[in-house]
Swiss-Prot record:
It catalyses: (6S)-5,6,7,8-tetrahydrofolate + NADP(+) = 7,8-dihydrofolate + NADPH + H(+); dUMP + (6R)-5,10-methylene-5,6,7,8-tetrahydrofolate = 7,8-dihydrofolate + dTMP. The keyword Hydrolase does not apply. Residues 197-521 are annotated as: Thymidylate synthase. This is Bifunctional dihydrofolate reductase-thymidylate synthase. It comes from Zea mays. Bifunctional enzyme. Involved in de novo dTMP biosynthesis. Key enzyme in folate metabolism. Can play two different roles depending on the source of dihydrofolate: de novo synthesis of tetrahydrofolate or recycling of the dihydrofolate released as one of the end products of the TS catalyzed reaction. Catalyzes an essential reaction for de novo glycine and purine synthesis, DNA precursor synthesis, and for the conversion of dUMP to dTMP. The gene is DRTS. It holds the Pfam family Thymidylat_synt.
């Protein structure tokens, strides 16, 4: 393709949207003395794959850059192969006459107009803006910028060129890789998507409890995020859940179960969620966030009284706390609502003799949760930082033996990670709750211990779909994920027993509608 010169005149013609690709430090330093102040082969590989790959094999992508960025590319590597190189310059002396796959434009507006016109609108799949500093400072927040792909440099590196930070009122993380260290530089790859056209109203609670999502402020103006490159779009962590559900429905073993409902089942599954940039609350259906928070606080309090949750409008334990159910499992002597020595009791009073939900167990048994926190603070390399709800001697006293039964915590690089083992996992109703609950617990313990949240690893024994959930889940897996929300916690809370529901605030949760599924009891 011969080079073309487009002037800077704008006639209000249609323009292409674009996505920014940039590597930057925590204060958004992107260069020093006109070059990248780091050498990261992994970053170059990511850049090449992102900007070169197309879904349509007959199309190519375009990369837009300023003249200085073009000149900073080694001569042997320019133009960037397999891509249309669009160079922004007003210099009349710029020599382009013999360069193939290069277009010269006098402004960003003229470049975007040119790419929206024939033949480029038919041959160019995606448009990436790749630098330099002046271009990015002006167009990182431009209304046509639909995504930002950031190599997040987490090591301290001196820079003299900076760009504005990502505007979190407009953009939210879609995907964040787990951190890697290369050339002694810690970094990760983060893709942000535009969810609003302009700065949203401030996320105030307007008198609501913070655990209530403010749907007015959190409503996305963007509903479909398929504009992302497929390699990024498919990395949304919710696909771990959706793909597992689909696999179980398609090829799971047919099993009977204690409820008589019947399941499709797989054994030995794992999902891993990155807690550093956002919070894994599923978006392909609305998850009962207030219920997640109140139940976890109830566990932490050591309570076994389902009526405490009922009084807050949380009815997730009603089925296992009813008179009829307690009678059916040999607990007819137990008061209705008394669930026995379940999760919270084992977390805070392991080994104590359980009498009923009204007894005062202060100082009785072993407080596993406080032991976990003490070890994280004082012996973070301990490999025995364990929280277990599985107490064989108490199982027959429980209304329901623990499903999520065992958690191990791990400290590295100032971050706290959690791996939870779940013996039995109801993929439709339970697992979305469980992912959120243990991720929240990790956030809380991390804050108490002056750490940052790292990973949540979810290991499942019997992962099953109840037969009466199949149709609802088939509907759910057809939905397209949206960005996970961001969780903010009252930073003044440093005692695990001091948290209240109002200390937690979700920002940017705009899921698909609720999908009804009946609980098997």
């Amino acid at each position: 393709m011969a080079a073309v010169l487009a002037n800077g005149d704008s006639q209000g013609r249609p323009q292409r949207n674009y996505q920014v690709v940039v590597a930057g430090t925590r204060d958004m330093g992107i260069g020093k003395d006109g070059v990248l102040p780091w050498k990261l082969p992994g970053d170059l590989k990511f850049f090449k794959e992102l900007t070169l790959t197309t879904s349509d094999p007959v199309k190519k992508n375009a990369v837009i850059m300023g003249r200085k960025t073009w000149e900073s590319i080694p001569v042997k590597s320019r133009p960037l192969p397999g891509r249309l190189n669009v160079i922004l310059t007003r210099s009349g002396s710029f020599d382009f006459a013999t360069v193939e796959n290069v277009v010269i434009c006098g402004s960003m507006e003229s470049a975007l107009e040119l790419l929206a016109s024939t033949p480029y609108c038919l041959s160019i799949e995606k448009v990436f803006v790749i630098g330099g500093g002046q271009v990015l400072r002006e167009y990182l927040k431009g209304p046509a910028c639909e995504a930002i792909h950031l190599t997040d440099i987490q090591s301290s590196i001196e820079c003299d060129t900076f760009i504005p930070p990502v505007d979190f009122s407009v953009f939210q993380p879609w995907y964040s890789s787990f951190p890697v260290i290369e050339s002694n530089i810690r970094h990760s790859f983060v893709s942000f998507v535009r969810v609003r056209k302009s700065v949203a109203e401030t996320h105030e609670s307007n008198g609501k409890e913070s655990t209530e999502v403010d749907t007015k402020n959190d409503k996305f103006e963007t509903e479909n995020f398929s504009f992302l490159p497929k390699m990024v779009y498919d990395r949304h962590e919710e696909y771990q859940y959706l793909n597992l559900v689909e696999d179980i429905i398609r090829s799971g073993a047919q099993k009977n179960d204690r409820t008589g409902t019947g399941t499709l089942s797989k054994f030995g599954c794992q999902m891993r969620f990155n807690l550093r940039k956002n919070f894994p609350l599923l978006t392909t259906k609305r998850v009962f966030w207030r219920g997640v928070v109140e139940e976890l606080l109830w566990f932490i309090s050591g309570s076994t009284n389902a009526k405490v949750l009922q009084e807050k409008g949380i009815h997730i334990w009603d089925g296992n706390a009813s008179r009829e159910y307690l009678n059916s499992v040999g607990l007819a002597h137990r008061e209705e609502g008394d669930l026995g020595p379940i999760y919270g009791f084992q977390w805070r009073h392991f080994g104590a003799e359980y009498t009923d939900m009204h007894a005062d167990y202060t100082g009785k048994g072993f407080d596993q949760l406080m032991d976990v926190i003490d070890k994280i603070k004082n012996d973070p390399e301990d490999r025995r930082i364990i929280l277990s709800a599985w107490n064989p001697s108490d199982l027959k006293k429980m209304a329901l033996p623990p499903c999520h039964m065992f958690a191990q915590f791990y400290v590295e690089n100032g971050e706290l990670s959690c791996q939870m083992y779940q013996r039995s996992a109801d993929m439709g109703l339970g697992v979305p709750f469980n992912i959120a609950s243990y991720s929240l617990l990790t956030y809380m313990i991390a804050q108490v211990c002056d750490l940052s949240p790292g990973d949540f690893v979810h290991v499942i024994g019997d992962a099953h779909v109840y037969r009466n959930h199949v149709r609802a889940l088939e509907e759910q897996i057809q939905k397209m994920p949206k960005p996970f929300p961001i969780l903010k916690i009252n930073p003044s809370k440093k005692d695990i027993d001091s948290f209240m529901a109002s200390d937690f605030k979700l920002v940017g949760y705009d899921p698909h509608q609720k999908i009804e599924m009946k609980m098997a009891v």
